[in-house]
């Protein structure tokens, strides 16, 4: 795999085929080791070591990045379309098949989406910053309770109805038993 990065266009692109030493050429090209590059290398190496991040990190290795500032990198403009498509596909494929999850996915949002919108990765917080509010809301988990997401199984409704009928029958039966029980005690008391 090849990881390409353009560091503020100060020098030529640096290539490496070893995913664990992503920025070794970049560190050598600057003449001294910046803490930023070390943190960037450590972040990607740490994410690669976890099993659940492998697909996402492999996806980002084919994307070209450029440095914005000391804490942020962004996808270069010619790779934004690919990055957005890969990100949306990975998030959608890792989503549980449940109606309460990712309810804001709409076909029109993806057909009319501007795939040149920047994607910024913050190295300190390890988060992606997205400037499209609709896509951000669709890719994040729901934060508010929505009455449309409540799933009611018909079997539960039927069981609830049976329980209500049984409780009503039991209440009437015990109420009549108590009434007849007190009447028989009153009759027995009068006979004595």
From Swiss-Prot:
InterPro entries, A to Z: PIF6
Localisation per UniProt entry: Host membrane; Virion; Host cytoplasm; Host nucleus
Topology term for the membrane: Single-pass membrane protein
Gene Ontology cellular component list: host cell cytoplasm; host cell membrane; host cell nucleus; membrane; virion component
Swiss-Prot/TrEMBL keywords: Host cytoplasm, Host membrane, Host nucleus, Membrane, Transmembrane, Transmembrane helix, Virion
Transmembrane feature ranges: 154-174
Entry keyword annotation includes Transmembrane: yes
Role: Per os infectivity factor.
Record protein name field: Per os infectivity factor 6
Native species: Autographa californica nuclear polyhedrosis virus
Gene expressing this chain: AC68
């Amino acid at each position: 795999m090849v990881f390409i990065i353009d560091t503020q266009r100060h020098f030529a692109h640096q290539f490496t085929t070893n995913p664990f030493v992503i920025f070794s050429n970049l560190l050598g090209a600057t003449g001294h080791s910046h803490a930023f590059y070390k943190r960037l290398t450590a972040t990607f190496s740490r994410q690669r070591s976890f099993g659940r991040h492998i697909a996402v990190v492999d996806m980002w290795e084919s994307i070209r990045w450029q440095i914005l500032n000391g804490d942020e990198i962004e996808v270069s403009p010619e790779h934004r379309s690919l990055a957005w498509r890969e990100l949306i596909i990975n998030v959608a494929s890792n989503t549980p098949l449940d109606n309460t999850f990712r309810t804001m996915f709409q076909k029109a949002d993806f057909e009319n989406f501007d795939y040149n919108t920047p994607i910024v990765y913050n190295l300190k917080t390890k988060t992606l910053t997205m400037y499209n509010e609709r896509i951000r809301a669709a890719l994040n988990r729901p934060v508010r309770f929505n009455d449309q997401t409540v799933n009611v199984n018909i079997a539960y409704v039927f069981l609830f109805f049976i329980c209500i009928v049984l409780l009503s029958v039991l209440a009437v039966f015990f109420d009549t038993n108590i009434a007849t029980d007190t009447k028989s005690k009153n009759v027995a008391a009068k006979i004595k």
